[in-house]
Swiss-Prot record:
The gene is mtgA. Peptidoglycan polymerase that catalyzes glycan chain elongation from lipid-linked precursors. PANTHER family: BIOSYNTHETIC PEPTIDOGLYCAN TRANSGLYCOSYLASE, MONOFUNCTIONAL BIOSYNTHETIC PEPTIDOGLYCAN TRANSGLYCOSYLASE. This is Biosynthetic peptidoglycan transglycosylase. It is a single-pass membrane protein. It is found in: Cell inner membrane. GO terms for molecular function: pentosyltransferase activity; peptidoglycan glycosyltransferase activity.
Length: 242
């Protein structure tokens, strides 16, 4: 093969390598920076903002009001763990048993796909990654999840998650959600309110905290039972999450 034919292939390989290096540096820097600095924006916020602009909604502003864990009701952290990831204090980013159960379920029910993402994985997806499903994205998700689990404390992961999670159309973070739905700061959320917010997390654009469907109410009740079974507020302090 001539040098002329090799040149474009060599260029593409170098470009791909440099792009990967740049992304690793970017994401690695983000993990290090956000271990101590409040997160100002997330990938999901950027996606919603761009979508709004393309739709002509120029008044739409995606943002969250950052609050520390000390300014968030302990019920809220407990509620999202009860709803999404009860083994959060124990695992290193992945719940192997939940993944196995999800795979078995999905083989039997192709029309109803069940996920098994931990809070750590959800934090990575919300903060760093684009929407969609692909092996490349899954690989990046796994690497970044290990990254935050290594660099951040569990308390930090939970804090970031609660500050960037989407709780409704244009409502990002638990502080904005508490003020929008209950007219109070996140620090004053009670057990029932926290469970309601956690109940919409599977699909916050479909399920509404201000107009909860029967499914949302049923899920809220289930979350409340799980919160009690975990041990209530003591679960947070026992695992150094508050």
């Amino acid at each position: 093969m001539s040098k002329r034919r090799l040149a474009p292939l060599t260029f593409l390989r170098r470009l791909l390598f440099r792009t990967l290096v740049a992304l690793v540096v970017f994401w690695g820097g983000g993990i290090a920076l956000f271990s101590v600095v409040p997160v100002p924006f997330s990938a999901v916020m950027a996606e919603r903002q761009i979508s709004a602009w393309l739709s002509g909604e120029f008044g739409y502003v995606a943002h969250s009001d950052w609050v520390s864990m000390e300014d968030i009701s302990p019920w809220m952290g407990l509620a999202v763990m009860a709803a999404e990831d009860q083994k959060f204090p124990e695992h290193w980013g992945f719940d192997v048993l939940a993944i196995e159960k999800a795979l078995a379920h999905n083989e039997r029910n192709e029309s109803r796909i069940r996920g098994a993402s931990t809070l750590s994985q959800q934090t990575v997806k919300n903060l760093f990654l684009w929407d969609g499903r692909s092996w490349v994205r899954k690989g990046l998700e796994a690497g970044l999840t290990l990254g935050i689990e290594t660099v951040w404390s569990k308390k930090r992961i939970l804090t970031v998650y609660l500050n960037i999670a989407e709780f409704g159309d244009g409502i990002f973070g638990v502080e904005a959600a508490a003020r929008r739905y209950f007219n109070k700061p996140a620090s004053r959320l009670n057990m029932t309110e926290a469970a309601l917010l956690a109940a919409v997390l599977p699909n916050p654009l479909r399920y509404k905290a201000d107009a909860p469907s029967g499914y949302v109410r049923s899920r809220q009740s289930w979350i409340l039972r799980q919160m009690r079974q975990l041990g209530g507020e003591s679960f947070m302090t026992r695992n150094q999450l508050y």
